[in-house]
Regions:
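GST superfamily/GST-like fold recognition
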Residues: 162, 167-170
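N-terminal catalytic or cofactor-binding beta/alpha core of small enzyme domains
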Residues: 1-136, 149-158, 177-213
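A short acidic, helix-capping loop that chelates divalent metal ions and anchors anionic groups
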Residues: 172-175
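Hydrophobic, aromatic-enriched interface-forming segments
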Residues: 142-149
């Protein structure tokens, strides 16, 4: 089984992006999964095209996109991507779309097709703070998550996909006055667990992961 795992380049003034650091440390094989990786630009205009090209080259059964969400305290598997671009800051092309769709006339939302609750349960068993998140935001992370699931719907090879938001790493938090962070090794282990679980499960567990807010 082949998996494609992507990370983003640094953005917003950061010198590193932990998603790219973590993806770069993944083993080439995790259990029965052959792992391929790709770097995506933090760009509304170009990220989906780079992702599509990587998918066409690799032809993966599993795609996991990973992105930084500074301020989060857990490894957050996203449940849903929405068809909205509403940028708080400019992307790396200097663009700041407001209230624009990811895909014109596309559905309002796409849901992850990885077993996100089962993955979260296994990460917690491994001692990693993890959660199902119900909002991927409206920046490039949500954009690429929506684009991924849109591609998956029409892809000739069956393909499941999802998005993982990760906290800062300690070197970033040290410059930001005590922002929450997570060790890079723990982030890498979380990604490995997601791939392991996704390779062995096609259905999710029926457990409560809802939140009031």
């Amino acid at each position: 089984m082949k998996a494609l795992v992507t990370g983003f380049d640094p953005f917003g003034g950061d010198k590193v992006n932990p998603s790219l650091l973590a993806v770069g440390q993944l083993k080439k094989r995790i259990g029965e999964v052959v792992v391929h990786t790709a770097q995506l630009p933090t760009s509304y205009a170009h990220s989906a095209g780079v992702l599509r090209a990587a998918i066409e080259e690799v032809k993966p059964e599993i795609v996991l996109c990973v992105g930084q969400a500074g301020g989060r305290t857990e490894l957050c598997l996203e449940r849903v991507a929405i068809n909205v671009q509403d940028a708080r800051i400019r992307d790396n092309d200097g663009k700041q779309p407001i209230d624009k769709p990811v895909v014109k006339d596309g559905p309002a939302a796409h849901f992850a097709t990885l077993p996100i609750k089962a993955c979260v349960a296994e990460m917690r068993k491994a001692g990693l703070p993890a959660a199902v998140s119900n909002s991927a935001g409206t920046f490039v992370c949500n954009h690429i998550f929506y684009a991924l699931m849109d591609i998956a719907q029409s892809h000739p090879i069956p393909m499941r996909g999802g998005f993982l938001h990760i906290p800062y790493v300690p070197e970033q938090a040290a410059r930001l006055g005590g922002a929450p962070s997570m060790a890079l090794d723990d982030i890498v282990r979380g990604i490995e667990i997601i791939l392991e679980v996704s390779a062995t499960r096609t259905s999710d567990v029926h457990t409560v992961e809802g939140r009031i807010s």
